[in-house]
């Protein structure tokens, strides 16, 4: 399955993984409101953002079937907790945005996430093989949009007589068409978009971020309206309406 988002440039026959990033920050106040809405629907913040992102992608692509991937630690067994190693697996989250109201939609998003988590020990490669996906060098199999959430801070590290600060390297290798990384901090919610510059231009990402931010702001105002019609959640800015 390949997403139906409009591309700014023709998809090349072979993916080259050259990309760029854009960074945004949502306020601490908005983050608190989003947590409140998530709790009201028995969801996590990740589930809420996943639902919002899927709606934005759905409206941009005119598709109700939205597939994104997300990494998972895959340390479900207690014996694996103390071990040093890379156990990360990739989950495929397939959401249907055709729901009448917010409550029904977020219940669906929650179940999609829980079902994927329950099967996180199934290797992604095995899933691709089982689905008999026709492979292509122009895009990744099953999904081309990655959503992830950092659970550890990338803050500075202090050692005796040494101060270490993370430094971003030059250039950015984008493994997927789009990558959205969430960073929850004391000052709000950071959003980092990674995008394939062979497919999208910078203006497209600015637009996607603007629509996602508007939709999240609309979600934050639904604390007293858990059954709001899904179509009533606005993603367009005042200037665009």
Residue spans for each PLM region:
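Adenylate-forming
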Residues: 6-12, 19-206, 217-222, 232-235
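Short conserved active-site loop signatures built around small residues
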Residues: 208-211
């Amino acid at each position: 399955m390949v997403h139906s988002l409009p591309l700014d440039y023709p998809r090349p026959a072979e993916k080259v993984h050259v990309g760029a990033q854009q960074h945004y920050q949502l306020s601490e106040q908005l983050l608190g409101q989003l947590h409140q809405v998530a709790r009201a629907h028995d969801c996590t913040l990740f589930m809420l953002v996943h639902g919002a992102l899927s709606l934005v992608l759905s409206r941009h692509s005119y598709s109700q079937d939205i597939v994104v991937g997300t990494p998972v630690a895959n340390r479900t067994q207690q014996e694996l907790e103390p071990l040093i190693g890379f156990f990360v697996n990739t989950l495929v989250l397939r959401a249907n945005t055709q729901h009448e109201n917010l409550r029904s939609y977020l219940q669906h998003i929650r179940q999609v996430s829980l079902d994927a988590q329950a099967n996180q020990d199934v290797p992604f490669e095995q899933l691709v093989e089982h689905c008999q996906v026709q492979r292509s060098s122009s895009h990744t199999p099953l999904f081309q949009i990655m959503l992830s959430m950092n659970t550890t801070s990338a803050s500075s590290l202090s050692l005796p007589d040494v101060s270490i600060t993370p430094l971003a390297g030059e250039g950015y290798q984008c493994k997927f068409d789009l990558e959205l990384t969430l960073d929850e901090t004391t000052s709000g919610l950071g959003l980092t978009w990674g995008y394939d510059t062979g497919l999208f231009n910078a203006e497209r990402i600015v637009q996607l971020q603007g629509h996602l931010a508007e939709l999240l702001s609309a979600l934050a105002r639904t604390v007293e309206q858990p059954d709001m019609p899904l179509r009533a959640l606005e993603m367009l800015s005042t200037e665009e309406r």
